[in-house]
């Protein structure tokens, strides 16, 4: 097992992922997160509205403009009960809340845990009919935490590229669970199914699978010729690790995780919290 200490990885600010390319604007976006803060949602809206990086903090006027520009275009799905209490003005909190869909899941059984950003950018020049799609998937929540996060950004390409198996179906399922009315985004899903994606040279297959909503969802099939495996996860279970270890035989395997002592402590805390019954009001 290789332990990652303090050497920084190359990074890309999450807001830069959301910001439209030159000559384009955000036409539609679907963001999912486990937890969120309204300031994090505000920062995302400013980026989606094209706010420059050096002004990413935004002024009240910039935020009001972003809200007006993106209303009905941007949808943020968060686990119910995991939206932090507002730390912005009440009027602005109401405006930001209009972008949020709280997904009801009993966390004693399961939670809403996907973190994705799927964005369609439309040209500012209406004579140009070509939109551009961008897809991010990773571990970051819409909060101000400074945890070490990992994500991948894929861009639409007009030549070559690959299909992302399961993406359109997964987004449809997630959006429906979040409460979006299917007819309000059917055009986007229809268009998404035909998109080809530019991926890193070493990526041979890309597929999106939803875990937790179906008992028959399993790990992907073992690709041919695997000679190295990297597993990144803060929490682990013996069964999954055992299955993944068979992918490479005696070849190189890398596990990026928390230190075992901390991981065990966190797992126990999560387990105890999951078993804890909701408190009952006391009767005087």
Where are these regions (language model features)?
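PLD/PLD-like phosphodiesterase catalytic module centered on the HKD motif
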Residues: 1-284
């Amino acid at each position: 097992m290789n332990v990652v200490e303090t050497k920084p990885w190359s990074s890309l600010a999450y807001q830069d992922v959301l910001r439209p390319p030159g000559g384009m604007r955000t036409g539609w976006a679907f963001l999912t997160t486990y937890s969120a803060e309204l300031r994090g949602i505000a920062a995302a809206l400013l980026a989606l509205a094209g706010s420059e990086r050096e002004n990413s903090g935004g002024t009240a006027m910039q935020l009001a403009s972003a809200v007006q520009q993106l209303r009905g275009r941007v949808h943020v799905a968060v686990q119910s009960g995991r939206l932090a209490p507002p730390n912005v003005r009440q009027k602005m909190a109401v405006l930001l809340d209009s972008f949020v869909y709280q997904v009801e899941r009993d966390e004693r059984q399961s939670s809403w845990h996907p973190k994705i950003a799927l964005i369609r950018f439309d040209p500012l020049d209406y004579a140009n009919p070509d939109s551009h799609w961008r897809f991010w998937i990773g571990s970051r929540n819409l909060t101000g935490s400074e945890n070490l996060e990992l994500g991948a950004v894929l861009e639409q390409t007009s030549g070559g590229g690959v299909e992302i198996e399961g993406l359109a179906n997964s987004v449809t399922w997630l959006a429906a669970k979040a409460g979006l009315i299917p007819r309000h985004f059917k055009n986007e899903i229809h268009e998404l199914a035909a998109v080809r994606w530019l991926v890193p040279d070493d990526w041979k297959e890309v597929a999106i699978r939803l875990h937790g909503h179906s008992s028959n969802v399993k790990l992907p099939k073992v690709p041919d010729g695997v000679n190295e495996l990297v597993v990144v996860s803060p929490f682990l279970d013996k069964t999954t690790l055992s299955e993944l270890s068979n992918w490479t035989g005696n070849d190189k395997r890398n596990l990026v995780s928390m230190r075992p002592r901390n991981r065990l402590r966190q797992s126990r805390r999560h387990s105890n919290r999951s078993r804890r019954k909701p408190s009952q009001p006391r009767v005087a």
